[in-house]
Amino acid sequence: LAKDNEVIDPQLRTAMEMAPSATQWPNNDYARVLDIGDITIKPDGTVVGTYREIFKLFNERARRLAEVSIPYNASYQSVRVIQARTIKPDGKIMGLRGTDMRNTSMFNDYPLYDDTMSLGFSMPGVEDGCLIDYTFQEITRPVLMPGEFWQYWTFDGTDPVMLSRFTVHIPSDKAIHYQVFNDPNLHPKITLSSDGKVRNYVFEERNLKPIVIEPAMPGMNEVKKWLEISSMDTWQQIAAWYWALSKPEAVPDDSLRSEVNQLIAGKTSEPEKAAAIYAFVADKVRYVGLEFGLSAFRPHSATEVLQNLYGDCKDKATLLITMLNVAGIRAWPALLESGDNSLIHNQLPTLSSFNHCIAVAFVDNSEVWLDATSASCAYGDIPVSDRGAEAMVIRDGVGQFEMIPEYTPDQSGLDSVVNVQLNGNGGANIETSATMLGAESQQWRETARNLTPDQRLQLMQQWAQSVSTGATLQKWSLPDGSVGNGNFSIQMSLSAPHLAKTTVHFMLIPAAIGLNDSNAHNPFVQDTRVWPIVVSNPMTEHSVTTINLPSGYEIEELPPDVSLSTALFEYRRTTVESPDKRKLVISVTSISKNGVIPPALYTQVKDYYNAILHANGDLIIMKKTG
C-alpha cells in the first residue's frame, strides 16, 4: 500500500469538488465520481492495468460498496492494491492497512478451481456522505493466447457517473481494433508518444445519468455505453484456439467407456442413448457455478471430471461431449453469453464475449442443444437464459455462429384442468391438474428438486390457498424434479369451504378459478416508459374450468366473454352453459409472443393488463330455485 494515504492528489481533489449531494440523486444510493482505467500493452502481450474508483456514498444502503472484492485468476493474473482510503465528510482521511486485506480462493472446496482467487478488503470509517477511494493494479500475463489481448470497459450503469475514462497505451507497431456501443458520439483521442513508439487511446464520458431499470427491458449490453478492444482479426482465431485446448481433454479411458456402456445398455435409438447420457451428466455431476473463463479456459479432462463428479460449465460440456462420442453420437462445444441475446458476431472477437459453454449434438440427423449445468432441464430442452443467444459452435476447429432457438408460444406455459363440485352452502370439492411446459416446467422442476418432504407439502398447501382462501388439501402429487421428459405435471384435490358467497337468494362464485397466475397482477405500473418492452419468454396459458351447480340453484347471470389483444399479447375467456343447465365450462387462453414492443405502445400494454385484472373480478350469479 502507498504510504501517502493522506495526500490529496489532483484526481482526488477534482473528485471532491465535483462529488454530488444525495439530494441531487434521491433515487440512488451512491454516485461513481471517478472511474478510471489505464492499461498498457507490453510488446509481449502482457497487459498492465491500473484502476481507480472513487464513490460518494449517500446512505446506509451504499455501505455495501465498502466491502471490495477483486476477482482474478492466479494462473495468469496478479493483483495488488496500490491505495485505499476513506475521506469522511469532515475531510478526515482514513487509510486502509495492509493487514486489513485478504487473499482467498473463491472455491476452496473444489481443488480443480483453486486458481480462482479474490483480493478483498473492507474500507475503514464508512458513513453517509463519505468518499471511498481505492486504486489497484492487475497484471495479465500472455499465457492464454500469446501475443493477443482484449479489454472491456463500461462507462455507465444504474448509478450516476461524473467521470469515466479508459486509456490504452500500445506499441505503435501493434494493431488494435476498438468498438463503441450505444454512443455514436464517443470517439477516442489518439496521440503518439514523443519517441513515436507508443500510441495512446483515451475514451472519456462525463456526467452520465443512471440507466433506468424497467421490467422486460432490453439487455444491458443494448442500453449501456460500453467499449471493447481486441488485437484479434477474426472469430476463427478463438475457435481454433479453444478447439486446441479442449480436444485433448475429450479423450475417454476404460472407466469412462464402461460408464457409457452401462448408461446405454438396452437402449437402441440415438435419442434414448443421448437422453441417458445427458441425464447422468446433468443430474449426477455436481455443477460448480463458475462463469466461463474465471477458472482459466482449458477444461479439465473428461476422465478427471467423471472421477470427481463435479465441474464448471466447460468441464461438464467436455464430459458430455466425450461420453456422447463414445456412444457413437457426434457432439461439439458451443460458447455463448448466457442471459444476453446480443448478436455476438457483430462484436469484436474477444474471449470476454462468452460466459458459458454448452454442447450441441447431432442425434438422429437433428441438432440438439444440451446444457448439462441445468439439472432442471429435460433432455431436448435448454434453459431460458440460453435461448435466443447467439452461440459459436466449434466443429473440428472451425467456429460457426448459430442462434439457440427461442421457445414458440406453444412450447412453454401452463395447461390446467379444474373440476369444481359446488354444494349448497358455497363450499366446493375441487380437482385440479396442471401440466407445465418449457420455461414453466424448468422453474417448477428446479423448485421441486430442492424441497424437503415437509416443504413440498407446504408448497402444495400454499397453492391450494391460491385457488380458494381457506382450502385444505385432500390429496396431491408433485414430482421430485429429477431430469425426465419435458413436461412437469401436478395434481391436487382440495376442499374449499368458502369458494362462493351466499345470500338469502343468491350464490356468487368468481369466474377466475384455477392455476393461471401470470395475469394475476400488472407488471407495468409506471406512468411512462423509457425502453421497449422485450418479450423473450413467449408462452401459452390455457385453462378449462368445469363448475357443477349444486341442487336447488340455477344460473341467473353469466359474465360476458372477453377478447383482448395488443401488440404481442392475446387473452380470451368464454363461458358456456351445458344443455341441461347444470354445468358451466370456463375456458381461458392467454398468449404472449416473442418480440419487441416500442415505448409508444406502452399505454396499450398497460391497459391490456388492467382489463384482464378487471375481468378477473367478474362473478357468476346463481339463484335459488323454488
Which functions belong to the PLM regions below?
Residues 2-626:
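A sensor for short, sequence-defined functional sites
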